[in-house]
């Protein structure tokens, strides 16, 4: 072979080998990048979210949205005016104390000092956070760790399980069970814990139990005796209690809200969560707080100072002023804490009546602004929608499409083992204007007409 031809062949082979090496290296780089771009294990399997799924579906303005728990009634004018006034003060548009703006924590110590019947240190026993979510997250990150177990009562607010898992702990679930066999007149009080079952969930690994009262989504207010039973187990097993009480002021006639932290032996082991959004109907402000003993709160403060650091100053100033205004009116008709509950009680009763007229079975809540309803009696055939989702998910999607009415499936608030118990229930929100409830009533009245 001519030397020139041989050189050409050798050159071609070299180019081919070089190209293959580059491709192989590029492939290795891609695989390495894929591994490094993978999610952290602590969020594995936590990407599904009922709010993301149903908020977009219900975004059509023609749909009457009773799904998400936000008010479409106006907040108190003095709270909005307080924000406008705060924004006009230059220093209140800058950073404030990271653990809570002085005006707000002092106001909280006054209001809750009266509620707890104890003096609260505004700077050591209260932490202001970004909503109730921030309070719960700070609590989990500060006090729960890998290998711990946290007891969660079903149905639960959906962020509890992901937050426990992100802390490296194991959620241990126990359901409320319906004790009444009646098909009408069911109350949230008819949903109870089996005390033997509850006791069986506590062991040496149990770090905490989460109590939500009034409960979202059922609206159950845990009675003093029910809370005492939980407290006894906490004390026996040296367990913490995380008490989510964001609906604490929305208590309807004939019922009493008891703070588990006020029971003997519970203050030193309880973190109580509160919310400005729920207190003053300003959910978009995203302000919440944790109240508890100094030896626990300081750990939450550590999380706060190394994550979010602080909350918006003018919002905190406005909420603080609002709390002080209503503190002076506590026990009087003009106090917003109690006035809102009176307003919502009528809306609750109206919603229960119109759901019952349609053939559904409402569970009338003792507190909060949600109502779950059993849709079993409607006998809606949804077999055409497949069997890859629980019945309530399919029912809500069908109802949004066919009836233009949005709700939330209750199995979004339970674990896999309790799906069958809750899949015929949907959750509706009634902190809505009369015009919104009018539109919902029109849909329900015409339910069987097409």
Swiss-Prot record:
Source organism, top-level taxon: Eukaryota
Enzyme Commission number(s) from the entry: 2.6.1.7, 4.4.1.13, 2.6.1.63
Signal peptide positions (record): none
Keyword Transferase: yes
Pathway it works in: Amino-acid degradation; L-kynurenine degradation; kynurenate from L-kynurenine: step 1/2
GO terms under cellular component: cytoplasm; mitochondrion
GO terms classed as biological process: amino acid metabolic process; biosynthetic process; kynurenine metabolic process; L-kynurenine catabolic process
Catalytic activity: L-kynurenine + 2-oxoglutarate = kynurenate + L-glutamate + H2O; L-kynurenine + glyoxylate = kynurenate + glycine + H2O; 3-hydroxy-L-kynurenine + glyoxylate = xanthurenate + glycine + H2O; an S-substituted L-cysteine + H2O = a thiol + pyruvate + NH4(+)
Subunit description: Homodimer.
Protein's name in the database: Kynurenine--oxoglutarate transaminase 3
Organism: Danio rerio
Upper lineage: Eukaryota, Metazoa, Chordata, Craniata, Vertebrata
């Amino acid at each position: 072979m001519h030397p020139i031809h041989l050189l050409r062949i050798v050159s071609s082979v070299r180019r081919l080998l070089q190209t293959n090496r580059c491709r192989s290296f590029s492939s290795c780089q891609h695989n390495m990048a894929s591994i490094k771009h993978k999610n952290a294990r602590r969020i594995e399997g936590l990407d599904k979210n009922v709010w993301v799924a149903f908020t977009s579906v219900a975004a059509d303005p023609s749909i009457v949205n009773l799904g998400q728990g936000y008010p479409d009634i106006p907040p108190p004018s003095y709270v909005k005016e307080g924000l406008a006034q705060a924004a006009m003060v230059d220093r209140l548009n800058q950073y404030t104390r990271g653990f809570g703006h002085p005006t707000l924590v002092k106001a909280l110590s006054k209001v809750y000092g009266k509620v707890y019947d104890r003096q609260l240190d505004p700077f050591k026993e209260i932490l202001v956070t970004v909503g109730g979510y921030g309070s719960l997250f700070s609590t989990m990150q500060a006090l729960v760790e890998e290998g711990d177990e946290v007891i969660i009562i079903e149905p639960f607010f959906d962020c509890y399980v992901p937050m426990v898992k992100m802390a490296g702990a194991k959620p241990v679930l126990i359901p409320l069970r319906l004790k009444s066999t009646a098909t009408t007149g069911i109350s949230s009080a008819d949903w109870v814990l089996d005390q033997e079952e509850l006791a069986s969930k506590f062991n040496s690994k149990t770090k905490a139990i989460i109590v939500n009262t009034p409960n979202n989504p059922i609206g159950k207010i845990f009675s003093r005796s029910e809370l005492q039973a939980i407290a006894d187990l906490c004390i026996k097993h040296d367990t913490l209690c995380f008490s989510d009480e964001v609906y604490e002021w929305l208590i309807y006639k004939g019922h009493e809200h008891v703070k588990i932290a006020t029971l003997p032996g519970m203050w030193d082991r309880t973190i109580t969560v509160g919310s400005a959004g729920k207190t003053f109907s300003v959910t978009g402000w995203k302000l919440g707080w944790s109240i508890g003993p100094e030896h626990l709160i300081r750990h939450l403060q550590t999380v706060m100072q190394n994550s979010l650091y602080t909350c918006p100053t003018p919002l905190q100033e406005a909420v603080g002023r609002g709390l002080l205004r209503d503190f002076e009116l506590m026990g009087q008709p003009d106090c917003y804490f109690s006035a809102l509950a009176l307003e919502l009680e009528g809306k609750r009763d109206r919603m229960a009546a119109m759901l019952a007229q349609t053939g559904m079975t409402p569970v009338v809540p003792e507190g909060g602004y949600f109502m779950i309803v059993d849709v079993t009696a409607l006998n809606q055939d949804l077999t055409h929608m497949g069997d890859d989702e629980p019945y309530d998910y399919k029912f809500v999607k069908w109802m949004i499409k066919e009836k233009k009415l949005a709700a939330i499936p209750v199995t979004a608030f339970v674990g896999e083992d309790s799906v069958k118990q809750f899949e015929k229930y949907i959750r509706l929100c009634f902190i809505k204007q009369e015009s919104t409830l009018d539109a919902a009533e029109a849909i329900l009245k015409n339910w069987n007409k097409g």
